[in-house]
């Protein structure tokens, strides 16, 4: 179902099925962005007198349980509605048999429209020889602007997402990149979202 919401899955750090594997390599309490549909919401008081919310987040690869309590509860709880597409800013803790997901903030799909944009371009690793890099750089230089740029490099090794912090492009770079055969799209800026 989340595939019906353009940009939602692409903004996430990983799929839900990939999270346990990714978490093995992350420092404790690392922040990630998770996309999915909200299911099975339960709100209840904590022993300390506050409130907590427990919910299931699901995507095309699987589902996991997340919790929100303390200060995060006030921001998260109103956005937890069954069958709602969301992006969850979460701290991930490794634990026996998997991961614990602590929701810090939730953005509904509609709220993501208000987040500043970034441009992401996908590049096949085999095309990143000197000539390919020069071609990509030339396209980007022609369309300088204010949008942050991310390059998703794909190859036999898997994929890597590179944030090119020194490069800013204009929205018109999207059309130029697509015309040159690159897959490019505008997304909510992950860095803005990860800072909460």
Predicted regions span which residues?
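Primarily single-stranded nucleic-acid-binding OB-fold modules
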Residues: 1-196
């Amino acid at each position: 179902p989340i595939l019906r919401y353009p940009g939602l899955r692409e903004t996430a750090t990983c799929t839900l099925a990939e999270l346990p594997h990714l978490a093995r390599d992350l420092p404790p309490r690392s922040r990630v962005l998770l996309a999915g549909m909200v299911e099975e919401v339960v709100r209840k008081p904590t022993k300390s007198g506050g409130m907590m919310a427990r919910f299931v987040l699901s995507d095309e690869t699987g589902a996991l349980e997340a919790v929100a309590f303390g200060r995060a509860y006030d921001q998260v709880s109103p956005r937890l509605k069954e069958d709602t597409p969301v992006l969850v800013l979460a701290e991930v803790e490794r634990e026996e048999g998997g991961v614990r997901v602590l929701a810090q903030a939730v953005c509904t799909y509609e709220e993501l429209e208000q987040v500043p944009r970034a441009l992401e371009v996908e590049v096949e690793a085999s095309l990143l020889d000197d000539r390919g890099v020069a071609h990509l750089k030339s396209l980007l230089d022609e369309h300088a602007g204010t949008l942050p740029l991310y390059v998703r490099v794909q190859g036999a090794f898997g994929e890597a997402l590179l944030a090119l912090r020194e490069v800013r492009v204009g929205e018109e770079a999207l059309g130029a990149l697509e015309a040159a055969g690159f897959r490019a799209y505008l997304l909510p800026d992950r860095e803005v979202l990860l800072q909460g």
